[in-house]
């Protein structure tokens, strides 16, 4: 793989993947609106607000794969969640599609599936029952 994009690269999981995926692609393109360590060998650091459609279109250019971890990961005002998590995800998918690179790994949340009895077995067909406004944006 030539170039792999990781959004939310300044977050906990993003930092783990940044280290763990070194060498998997020729270049790891790392993006977040939060500060990150400078680019190392085989890395590009590209700050980007995912709610900015044209910036996201540029961000996804020349990427062979995308790992989407970006957005707000806690409960917040619904308008903020919509911009970061819903519109940001939409822009990322559209940027990838328009650039001919439709492969995206999307990290959702247990808050999208909501509360179930501990004994309930859940699978990909289980009903979504978001437990918060944050959960709604991760469905």
Model segments located where?
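Conserved glycine-rich Rossmann-like NAD(P)H-binding loop of the short-chain dehydrogenase/reductase
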Residues: 23-37
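NAD(P)-cofactor binding segment of oxidoreductase domains
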Residues: 66, 76-105
């Amino acid at each position: 793989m030539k170039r792999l994009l990781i959004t939310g690269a300044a977050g906990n999981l993003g930092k783990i993947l940044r280290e763990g995926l070194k060498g998997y692609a020729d270049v790891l393109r790392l993006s977040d609106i939060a500060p990150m360590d400078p680019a190392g060998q085989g890395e590009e650091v590209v700050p980007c607000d995912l709610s900015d459609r044209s910036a996201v279109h540029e961000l996804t250019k020349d990427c062979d794969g995308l790992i989407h971890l970006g957005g707000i990961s806690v409960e917040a005002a619904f308008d903020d969640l919509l911009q970061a998590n819903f519109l940001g995800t939409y822009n990322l998918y559209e940027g990838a599609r328009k650039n001919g690179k439709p492969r995206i790994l999307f990290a959702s949340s247990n808050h999208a599936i909501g509360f179930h009895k501990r004994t309930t077995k859940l699978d990909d067909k289980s009903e979504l029952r978001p437990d918060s406004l944050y959960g709604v944006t991760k469905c």
